[in-house]
Structures are given as structure tokens and as C-alpha cells.
Amino acid sequence: MRFTKMHGIGNDYLFVNCFEEVVQDPSRQAVLMSRPHYGVGADGLVLIEPSETADFGMRVFNADGSEAEMCGNAARCIGKYVYERGMTDKTDLTLATKAGIRQMRLSLAGDKVGRVQVDMGSPELNPRNIPVDLPGEIVLRYRLKILGQSWLITCVNMGNPHCVIFVKDLEAIDLNTLGPMFENHPIFPQRTNVEFVRVTRRDVLQMRVWERGSGETLACGTGASAALVAAVLSGLSDRTVQVQLLGGNLELSWNAEDNHVYQQGPAAFVFDGEWLA
């Protein structure tokens, strides 16, 4: 089975062109291929599929085999893949995901895709739809106790669930300990992604992310979107920001008119390979 490794600011996935290849058990395949020493090593497996409702379809499987609803970094990589591999000549594309249809706009540098803008859709704030088992119509700076310490959490769904915590010192966060405890906390029936965010200016956020099913990653597009929404709701940032992640930077804007979050950033090829197992 042929595949291509790509990354969006360090959030790396193995992409399979399902116009040409067949993946019988993508969940199991994601686990096997994502292992760094026994497989290829990646944050997960992404299938590029035909779609009856959009230009292309996307399915994302995390490193533990669970299926994600949406991934902004993977979406940008697909935009670059389908254009540069000659699968389309369009620069405005639609992508079918488990979270719905997403619009993408490709910015070209010659015959290559330099950057991709993804319409991440509207944030869902109702706890019943995130989902998070807490009362009320919004979870904004709710006090949650973990390991004897109180954390103020804000919950947002950007196609998948996110828990955002604002901190003063990102380096002091023991993410390998705290990440799984937030991810698997009983208030999150479908688990959650976790973002620790430091606001350096009203237009700059720094972030570390613990992804549901993958652990700490260098970047997360839906997580960056959730961080922006949480920062605006908390009165900590403007609606247009740069989010600085371990793998690089993303530009995001939460549009007040259509309520959509727009994300822009790069995507890169790493290598093509063939899985023989």
C-alpha cells in the first residue's frame, strides 16, 4: 500500500490516496503505521477519499486507532496533496469530514501550494453538544480539580471536543501527567483534546496541546481554533491572532459576521513510501 507522509507545522500524518488504494481496516492500520519504532511514526493515518457531497473526503485516524471528526492540519495537507498531485486544478475546494463540509482556499507560489486557508466552521459552546457533562449553556472558566489543584477550563467543540486552560507558564506544565487526566476525566464522555494556552499579547497566543488518542503533538488546528474562541470569550484576546505552537505558527480569525473560525498555515510533503506488512 502506497502512502505519503506530510505535516502541518509538525503535526504529521500518513496519507493514503483511496482513489487508488484500499485500506481494509484503517483503525488497525493507523496503530501499526503510527508507531515510531515498529512502524513509520506519525500522529495518525488520513484517508483521502471520493465524496458525493464535496470535492474530496477525509477520514482521520489517531495513533491509537480512534477516529477523529476533524483535523485542520490534515485538511491543509490534503489541499496541497490533491493540487500538487494533479487530482484537481481548483484553488477553492470543499472537503467532506465527519464534522461536516469544510471550505478550503489554496494560495499558490508558482505551481506549488504555499499556504492553505480552512474554514473551520462555527464553534459549538453548548455543553450537551461538545459533549461535557456540566450544567448550563456554556462552560466558561469552570473550576475543575485535578491532582488537588483547581484549573479554570473553557470547553469548545470545533468538530471535536476541546478543553482550554489558560496558564502563565507553559514550560511548568507536566503535560504527560496532566494531559491524560484531562482527556479521560469523567465529565468528558467522548474524552477530550486539551490545550494549555499562554496569552502573550492580545493578538498572540502560545499553546501546547494534548490530542485525544495521540498524546502531545507539535500542533493542532482545531485546538488552535478552540484556543482563540476561549480567549475571546474570556476577554483575553482579539478576534484575529497568531497562535504559536511547538511546530510553528498559524494565523486564525473568528469572524463576527458568520461566526466561523478561519485558519491559515503551511503544509509540507516529507516522503512517499510503501507499506509492505
Identify the function of each model-found stretch.
Residues 1-112, 163-277:
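A glycine-rich beta-to-alpha transition motif near the start of alpha/beta enzyme domains, typified by
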Residues 1-22, 118, 130, 135-156:
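N-terminal, positively charged, Ser/Thr/Ala/Gly-biased leader segments
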Residues 86, 129-131, 143, 235-236:
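Glycine-centered secondary-structure boundary/capping sites
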Residues 115-123:
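Membrane helix-loop-helix hairpins that form the core translocation module of multi-pass transporters
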Residues 124-128:
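Short, charged/polar, Gly/Pro-enriched secondary-structure boundary elements
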